[in-house]
Amino acid sequence: MTYSLRILDLPESDRPRERLIAQGAKYLTHAELLAILLGTGQGPGKLSAVGLGQHVLQHFSEHQQDPLTVLRDVNASELTTIQGIGPAKATTILAAIELGKRICQARPPELTVIDDPAVAAAALAGELMWQSQERFAVLLLDVKHRLLGTQVVSIGTATETLAHPRDIFREIIRKGATRAIVAHNHPSGQTDPSPEDLELTQQLLSGAQILGLPLLDHLILGNGDFTSLRQTTSLWNDCPQDL
């Protein structure tokens, strides 16, 4: 695609809005999604809206990170330093980013059945996703795996959390839950478990066996993604739970 070509000069099948309607948003490039928000082009060389979207992404790729990661936390003053992005375009982008965060953080209502790691991660996203510090939280469930509530047990630093099995089980017992899923976030966005994560999970599984309070999973959340330790490790085989 020629980025200086006007959107209206493109065949309809190549126009971002028409492609979104015909094929769905997931088939659009990052630049095309930005183009829909921007509406019109500008910037160096009088770029099209798609070209301006690509220019924005290239600007943020100079941070040696995924430009979407940088864009997630950008502010209006940073956006308006980019040629072609004025206050109107900047606020549209920021509003879309914030709406996306809120949708990601929306959690199911209480008494929803938590029968899948993705449902559990969605229920905890509001507490854990996009946080700059590590947080450790617990999903409190009844015997039918229905959600009774969520509880943040501890807040740590940018690189570690300070959760202790004693504090976690105290919350589970205090709230009258009979099943639990624990989770924490990695501010780095990486969801691979650390040796400390695995060690804590082993301790929790052993404690859950003794107390008769099955631990259903331990999730690690980051950058809109998650890892289920029950699905990716053998810890539950080594320390079976009455699920």
From Swiss-Prot:
Keywords carried by this UniProt record: Hydrolase, Metal-binding, Metalloprotease, Protease, Zinc
Pfam family, one: RadC
Keyword Methyltransferase set for record: no
Protein's GO biological process: proteolysis
Superkingdom field: Bacteria
Disulfide bonds: none
Residue ranges occupied by any MPN domain in the UniProt entry: 113-235
Residues binding Zn(2+), per UniProt: H184, H186, D197
GO molecular function annotation: metal ion binding; metallopeptidase activity
CDD domains: MPN_DUF2466 (cd08071)
Motif JAMM motif per UniProt: ranges: 184-197
Similarity field: Belongs to the UPF0758 family.
Protein name: UPF0758 protein AM1_4368
Source species: Acaryochloris marina (strain MBIC 11017)
